[in-house]
Amino acid sequence: MRHNSAGRRLGRTTSHRIAMFRNMVTSFLQHEKITTTDAKAKELRSIAEKMITLGKRGDLHATRQAAAYIRDKKVVTKLFTEIAPRYTERPGGYTRIIKLGIRPGDNAPVSVLELVEAEMKPKKAAAKPAKAPKAAKAAPVAAAAAEEAPVAEAPVAEAPAAEETTEA
């Protein structure tokens, strides 16, 4: 039974898997994008988002926790000074996975894990204006369609006239 066994093993020993993900997180935060297999990308996403959350906290303990996992001090500095401030208003979901297809050599599904660049706007609790009746909305649409219809017929009427002149 697989009780309390979350995560993917990826056909590696525990030490190999941890070392691989430490390297991948370091590269991902350094380049802000990484191409890998789907399974690795899905596992890496959770680790990377935890690192960005540590960067958002910004205290000394969070810095030391991130430095214990990320292998390069310059990348830790980049995380806390450049990457984390971009996501101060975002409550999670800092990365996206884009599937690329299959890799030609071994037919493995490949995807790109990248940071989300679009700034999130907080939802406003403003009241929405009252909706107009459906009949009122349908009338302007019908009027717009009626205006477009004669425009579409005009070129059709000119085309037969052009054919008659060529025959004569």
UniProtKB/Swiss-Prot annotation:
GO cellular component, one term: cytosolic large ribosomal subunit
Stretches for region Disordered: 123-144, 149-168
Keywords for this protein: Ribonucleoprotein, Ribosomal protein
UniProt-listed PROSITE patterns: RIBOSOMAL_L17
Low complexity biased stretches: 127-144
An annotated Gene Ontology molecular function: structural constituent of ribosome
GO biological process: translation
Pfam family, any one: Ribosomal_L17
InterPro entries: Ribosomal_bL17 (IPR000456), Ribosomal_bL17_CS (IPR047859), Ribosomal_bL17_sf (IPR036373)
Complex and partners: Part of the 50S ribosomal subunit. Contacts protein L32.
Family matches, as NCBIfam families: L17 (TIGR00059)
Family as reported in the entry's similarity comment: Belongs to the bacterial ribosomal protein bL17 family.
Protein name: Large ribosomal subunit protein bL17
Lineage, opening ranks: Bacteria, Pseudomonadati, Thermodesulfobacteriota, Desulfuromonadia, Geobacterales
Gene name, Swiss-Prot/TrEMBL: rplQ
